[in-house]
Each structure stands twice: as structure tokens, then as C-alpha cells.
Amino acid sequence: MEPNNLKEELVSVFEKACSSHKERLDFICSVRESDTFSNVDVPLAPIKTIIEIAKNEENQTEILKLAIENIKTLSTVGSGQYIASHFSTHNEVAIIFCISYFLYHFNFLHDENKKQLLKRAFEAVAEKIADYLNEN
């Protein structure tokens, strides 16, 4: 699946999650500024902001910032620097990563179709990063 189509499909799932889990999302957005993931503090920007930014093509820089924030803990070790660099120049991949990360992290994917969508999204990101690492 092309990154652009994948992004649109993810944004659609994300919007549905927002409308069907409004209370939960409001709670997450208001109280959770960071979360511990594998003993590393991972910044969690408000989900609704990411959805709005992802829908507005003029705000690509913000999505890139969010993507880089989400992986900045990796940038001090090995290939993390390459991943951060790749995200800073490939906004479709950054958007797919951000949305997938939040859908996965907050467990909004309960049916098999959504799980398959998430799998495709992470595979697309991994493939793009692998290509980037091979080129550099």
C-alpha cells in the first residue's frame, strides 16, 4: 500500500477512535504528558492535536517534530540517529509512524482488520527506514 493511502486510512481509523472514545481521549490528553515505555520516558503529545495536524497538509513541520520527539530517546544510540534523520525529511513516513504509535499505545485496535492495518503501517515504516539505512 502506498504511504499516502495508508496515511489516509490511519487518519480515518484515528478519527473514529476519537468519536467513539471521547471521554477516554479527553482524559489521556489532559493528564498524560509522558509515559514510561521500556524504562524510557516517551513524550506523548495530545492525540487530538496529531489528528488535526495530520489532516492539514500545511502543518507537516509539526508532525515531523512530534515524530522526532517520539524517537528522540533513540537518537543517542546506533541507528536511532539515522531513523531521526529519515523522519525529518520524509513526512509521510513520520505521519504513519506517529498515528500508528498512538493507536497501538492506547490500544484502540480491537478487531482483526485494524490490527492488520497497524501491521501494514509498521511494515511500511520499517521498509522505508531500511531503504534509508541501506542508502546511507
Swiss-Prot record:
Cited Pfam families: DUF1951 (PF09188)
Query: What is the protein name given in its UniProt record?
Result: Uncharacterized protein MG354 homolog
